[in-house]
């Protein structure tokens, strides 16, 4: 058995928070205690309106992938989070672009899970005011 087959892959967890105003990527170790690299939409585009765009998400994911590979991580588990709460439960436009760009950068994607916060009958939802 060669040495390359015997080496075990190092995994990390990519926490992707994709709202409709911005996209944040934070890569941690498996426990979530140590942050390896993080990036946001504002770090790669100039206009505020472009922070949540798929283009910004792709640029972020490519730069994050380079840093991850330099840190020696080969694979990622992806946790996607939308706005949640009383707001919209679906993730923003940057979520799918982020996952595609990470996979295209040569990282192995393990699990993709949705961790959008869902209220268990929390605060009262806003109603229309009737006159």
Curated annotation (Swiss-Prot):
<keyword id="KW-0689">Ribosomal protein</keyword>
<dbReference type="GO" id="GO:0005840">
    <property type="term" value="C:ribosome"/>
</dbReference>
<protein>
    <recommendedName>
        <fullName>Small ribosomal subunit protein uS11</fullName>
    </recommendedName>
</protein>
<comment type="function">
    <text>Located on the platform of the 30S subunit.</text>
</comment>
<comment type="subunit">
    <text>Part of the 30S ribosomal subunit.</text>
</comment>
<keyword id="KW-0694">RNA-binding</keyword>
<dbReference type="Pfam" id="PF00411">
    <property type="entry name" value="Ribosomal_S11"/>
</dbReference>
<dbReference type="GO" id="GO:0006412">
    <property type="term" value="P:translation"/>
</dbReference>
<dbReference type="InterPro" id="IPR018102">
    <property type="entry name" value="Ribosomal_uS11_CS"/>
</dbReference>
<dbReference type="InterPro" id="IPR001971">
    <property type="entry name" value="Ribosomal_uS11"/>
</dbReference>
<keyword id="KW-0687">Ribonucleoprotein</keyword>
<dbReference type="InterPro" id="IPR019961">
    <property type="entry name" value="Ribosomal_uS11_archaeal"/>
</dbReference>
<comment type="similarity">
    <text>Belongs to the universal ribosomal protein uS11 family.</text>
</comment>
<dbReference type="GO" id="GO:1990904">
    <property type="term" value="C:ribonucleoprotein complex"/>
</dbReference>
<keyword id="KW-0699">rRNA-binding</keyword>
<dbReference type="GO" id="GO:0003735">
    <property type="term" value="F:structural constituent of ribosome"/>
</dbReference>
<dbReference type="GO" id="GO:0019843">
    <property type="term" value="F:rRNA binding"/>
</dbReference>
<dbReference type="InterPro" id="IPR036967">
    <property type="entry name" value="Ribosomal_uS11_sf"/>
</dbReference>
């Amino acid at each position: 058995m060669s040495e390359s087959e015997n080496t075990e892959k190092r995994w990390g967890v990519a926490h992707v928070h994709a709202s409709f105003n911005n996209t944040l990527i934070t890569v941690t170790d498996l426990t979530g205690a140590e942050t390896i690299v993080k990036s946001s939409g504002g770090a790669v585009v100039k206009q505020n309106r472009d922070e949540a765009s798929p283009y910004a998400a792709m640029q972020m994911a490519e730069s994050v992938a380079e840093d991850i590979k330099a840190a020696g991580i080969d694979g990622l588990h992806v946790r996607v989070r939308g706005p949640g709460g009383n707001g919209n439960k679906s993730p923003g436009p940057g979520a799918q672009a982020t996952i595609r760009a990470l996979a295209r950068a040569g990282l192995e994607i393990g699990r993709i899970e949705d961790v959008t916060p869902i209220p268990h009958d929390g605060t009262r939802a806003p109603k229309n005011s009737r006159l």
